[in-house]
Design a protein with these regions (language model features):
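Conserved small/polar residues in nucleotide/adenosyl-binding loops
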Residues: 165-167
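Glycine-rich SAM-binding Motif I of class I
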Residues: 43-47
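Conserved alpha-helix/loop element of class I SAM-dependent methyltransferases that forms part
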Residues: 16-32
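A short glycine-rich, Lys/Arg-flanked "PGG" loop and its adjoining helix->strand segment in the class I
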Residues: 110-124
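A short SAM/SAH-binding and catalytic strip from SAM-dependent methyltransferases
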Residues: 96-107
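Class I SAM-dependent methyltransferase SAM/SAH-binding core
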Residues: 48-85
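Conserved class I S-adenosyl-L-methionine
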Residues: 33-41, 125-148
Length: 167
């Protein structure tokens, strides 16, 4: 596949799903794979992978309304807290385990990553782009870390900071 074609395809996936990390993740996933999406939200990525890569997908999401929306899409999504571990899944249950822009929401990130590596052959972790120009501009003009759709917390009330307070 030519670089130009690949760039166009990635742009198309980004346009459809609205996030550049989804485009990159979709390139990494082999068709027909077994995929676990941790913190899957309403299943947008999982649904796209099922439709376009024919993956056998499952998701775990902590937010009840998002779980309901994912299930309404016909996806297999369970409500659960990934900080509690993935004890329901034996070693090597999945080809890919995805943690997309979710690690910063966890209270036990090392445990979450260890569990990903235990249940999956491959782990894919993405992060919000804290260096994006819009984030930098907001920081410059307001003097405060911005709150966005991908970064919904102030620095002092993020889950990892709050977990330190409750030690």
């Amino acid at each position: 596949m030519s670089a130009t074609h690949e760039t166009r395809r990635r742009g198309f996936v980004r346009e459809i799903l609205g996030r550049s990390d989804y485009a990159i993740i979709s390139e990494l996933i082999e068709p027909g794979s077994r995929v676990l999406d941790l913190g899957c939200g309403d299943g947008e990525l999982l649904g796209w992978l099922a439709a376009n890569k024919q993956v056998e997908g499952r998701g775990i999401e902590i937010d009840g309304p998002r779980v309901q929306r994912a299930i309404a899409r016909g996806l297999t999504v369970y409500q659960g807290d990934i900080d509690a571990g993935l004890t329901d899944y034996p070693d090597g249950s999945f080809d890919y385990v995805i943690l997309s822009q979710t690690l910063q929401e966890t209270r036990r990130p090392l445990n979450v990553i260890q569990e990903m590596l235990r249940v999956g052959r491959h782990a894919i972790v993405t992060f919000p782009n804290y260096g994006h120009w819009s984030v930098r501009l907001s920081l410059l003009t307001s003097g405060r870390a911005p709150r966005t759709r991908c970064l919904p917390y102030s620095w002092f009330d993020s889950p990892n900071i709050l977990s330190l307070i409750h030690i």
